[in-house]
Amino acid sequence: MRVTRFSFSTLLLSLTLLAGCAGQSCDEPLSGEACRDEKLLYQNDMLQAKLLIAAGDPENYELAGALLKRAGPGDTRGEVPFYQAVLLINEGPQLEEVLDLLEKAAARKHPHAIALLYKIWSEPFLATEADPLRAELYRARYADLDVAKSGYPSFEKAQAVVNTLVDRSNPAGAQVSGR
């Protein structure tokens, strides 16, 4: 009987250790140099692109676009297509391309993409006419997000961020940084 307990304990410990190795993310210092480097470069590219877009200077848009393109393969949360859509809006809206990018980001449950889709169809913004039913669908999709259930960011806060990013009369982007 004692051998069975030891074997079971050993098996349980082994499975736990194996699961830990398999589930290790690139955020861990021991996750491997290449994995960690890719994660850090992705984070750097996204941070730089966001800052360039929030600054609102059209001279920075080409670099922001290149950074987003390079970050694309590492994106799992829909950030890249969301910020690509914001870039297109700020450069001069092409509605179909913007909608395609936002739908890609929304499919990955990006909260700001869903808030921007709501804005497009509720005001209307970019679209020629409002579509209240479609807008409500996006409002409901936002409410189903895990972040919405936790209360951060609230729908109103997500809308404020979106408004700051696409409002060409406020190029400073001060609200985006939380000031």
Pin down the residues of each PLM region.
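Bacterial N-terminal signal peptides that target proteins for export
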Residues: 1-11
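Short helix-capping/linker turns of helical repeat alpha-solenoids
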Residues: 38-45, 52-56, 60, 73-81, ...
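Bacterial signal peptide processing site
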Residues: 22-25
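Terminal, low-structured helical/coil segments at or just beyond the last alpha-helical repeat
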Residues: 129-179
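Structural signature of tandem alpha-helical TPR/SEL1-like repeats
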Residues: 58-66, 91-101, 128-134
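C-terminal motif of bacterial Sec signal peptides marking the signal peptidase cleavage site
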Residues: 17-20
